[in-house]
């Protein structure tokens, strides 16, 4: 069977019978479309949190669920924690309170904590599916009729199958949605196998493959910026844009994740599951409506149009000292840094290079998308005017929590003669009256999953497309080059992007100077 067939054909018809008919998506009439209603209250939910004692649960999920409960965005929830640890309900509540106090951005009063704590129970995973089913039944009895279930799999990828099996054996599939953490497979074959396994129990519409980058307000603002304004979308194409950069350097190391990272690396951990998803928002065609099916289809079109990643367009790196970390092989070639060039072969973007970079232990922690516009003719300006001296005009999205959008362009320096300087216009979400109401990424995504909104989640087809286009790189990756901690990566990154230049660190230095 040719590669890609499993992705481009539907696996079963409505009766569950396998079919080779091409996959098609039909849209209802505009007035009948299921538009997003972000202000509609969610149904009562029982949330089963697998991996409830893990790092992600303590840092993000438990604080986020507490805020959703106490802010009344999701006021009717019961949370059942489960993990391999053998805890009582009170011990789990103690763990949850410590996590919320340490990591929550929205602090709870004593009264709020007492109210939230009543919603927390715990079932050791070793107690089996019957005990879990009984705990869910008790929680549903508290909430009353019309209760839905959200199963959050905050577990390592190798444990996902066991959790899905446990949910099936506990008969907790109906009225349920399941949230899965990255990575979704490690290559094309494993992604197809994982999707097929999950689809044996859950329908695709029940599955939410989470990417917390898309849960950030700044990432979602890309859609509003592009499609709600007539200013930039007419020039958002190969005729006016020279290249695009998506740059996510991190100062953080791996701490206790080195053993996990050794079998994963930066490409599988960050690029496939994060950077490519952000890229799709930047380059996708306008959807027919801001509703999940239409947006997912446009994202999938981007992934179908993406050219295979060539090894010659990739720089892999490894920070000095990585091989000395516990759990890392002394001859490890795992990359802690990667930079690559990709292309989208469609009418809008053919010939426009897209550069992506991410890594650990780098000089700064930043998250930017930079759009470089083609330069204007320079011959009319006198020598020494400074035109072009500071690179092309850039539109930059800062994806940090205090998100900004900035536009840099040339203007005349005050005084005699024609001397040009780079000028900047900036917009910050802090200028918006409701900036304090912004949800953190995981809070937003949990809320969307409870509403059944797939807009910010990855589809099976999308993830399989990306792994297929990564096949050559995964089969024969270039060797990882060492780079010093606290730098911007191996020197080869400059040859990769030449004759252009990386926007970082120039973007930060230039804006801070202003």
Task: Report the location of each language-model feature.
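N-terminal amphipathic/basic-hydrophobic helices that include classical n-h-c signal peptides
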Residues: 1-16
